Design a protein with these regions (language model features):
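Active-site bordering "gate/hinge" segments
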Residues: 1-135
């Protein structure tokens, strides 16, 4: 296991693939979608995905030293599309880390949704950059 200098584990040795049933993964994504849509009526499309990885690493050196590490990884990605006056813009958010799916609490989902919706709204309000020759 990856350990800090004081000997404590850097992250839990959990299998994120088995930490949440498929139906619960779908429910988590649906909660995220509802949060994003509720933040602004201009949000017309929400796309979210979950990804996880579980690696078990074993190293055997030629001097006989053995080492192992269990590395869980989860990631949630969110993209929203907002529309105003026929113009569409997108925003994205998300995150993750070496945890299981319990990391994605309602507060974390709210943060990701806020990030993506805010980015889309800023893009909707953006004006084109001035064009022309530079002097």
């Amino acid at each position: 296991m990856a350990r800090r200098a004081d000997g404590r584990q850097l992250y839990p040795a959990v299998d994120p693939l088995a930490s949440l049933a498929d139906a619960d993964k779908v429910a988590l994504l649906e909660r995220l979608e509802k949060k994003a849509r509720a933040m602004d009526p201009r949000v017309i499309q929400v796309m979210a995905s979950l990804a996880s990885e579980y690696e078990v690493i074993f190293v055997a050196r030629s001097d006989g030293h053995l080492a192992a590490d269990v590395r869980p990884l989860v990631r949630l990605s969110l993209q929203v599309i907002a529309e105003q006056n026929g113009r569409r813009e997108q925003g994205s958010g998300g995150g993750g880390g070496r945890f299981d799916y319990s990391y994605f609490t309602d507060d974390i989902l709210e943060k990701y949704a806020r990030q993506a919706v805010h980015q889309a709204m800023v893009n909707l309000d953006a004006r084109p950059a001035p064009a022309g020759s530079m002097t």
